[in-house]
């Protein structure tokens, strides 16, 4: 069992290289940039992926972003969703896939743009999405690795499109100075 997991881990760099070469990241940033709010929703181990992506988008591109677990989103925050928002549904195969599908159904039903990070063969969530990013097939436990990297690259392009330096986190603006005043 450990050998199988080790082999799957060893394959991830090549899978990511292939994935990163498949998408037109600048074009995606152009299509989905400048929106009111961005939602990143995942289940299982990809709750952390959703939180991290929202944090990075806020830091790098100065955009309003929120990361949520599927059940959190479906409990109440969905009511704040608007048609101009973008919802990234991080839904590789695994136990959380069904609830991620529910998230995509709600978001699409409201008229928000859905971007699905799913297995290439996924037709359930993929059919609801304006764009799909096909993730390599790995166990759900390893999927945060394969989902976080393309999101980071897309967020970089969101930042560049917005004219923000993704490495400075507004250090030279009143925002950065205000935060620095409370950080030792």
Region locations from a protein language model:
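A SIS-like phosphosugar-recognition module
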Residues: 1-184
């Amino acid at each position: 069992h450990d050998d199988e997991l080790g082999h799957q881990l060893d394959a991830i760099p090549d899978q990511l290289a292939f994935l990163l070469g498949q998408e037109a990241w600048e074009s995606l940033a152009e299509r989905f940039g400048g929106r009111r709010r961005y939602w990143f929703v995942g289940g299982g181990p990809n709750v952390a992926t959703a939180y991290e992506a929202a944090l990075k988008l806020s830091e790098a591109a100065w955009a309003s972003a929120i990361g949520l677990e599927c059940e959190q989103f479906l409990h109440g925050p969905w009511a704040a969703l608007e048609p101009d928002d973008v919802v990234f549904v991080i839904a590789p195969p695994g136990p959380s896939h069904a609830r991620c599908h529910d998230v995509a159904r709600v978001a699409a039903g409201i008229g928000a743009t859905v971007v699905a990070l799913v297995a290439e063969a996924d037709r359930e969530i993929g059919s609801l999405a304006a764009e799909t990013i096909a993730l390599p097939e790995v166990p759900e436990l390893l999927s945060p690795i394969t989902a976080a990297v393309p999101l980071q690259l897309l967020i970089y392009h969101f930042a560049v499109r917005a004219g923000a330096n993704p490495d400075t986190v507004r250090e030279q603006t009143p925002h950065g100075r205000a935060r620095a005043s409370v950080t030792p």
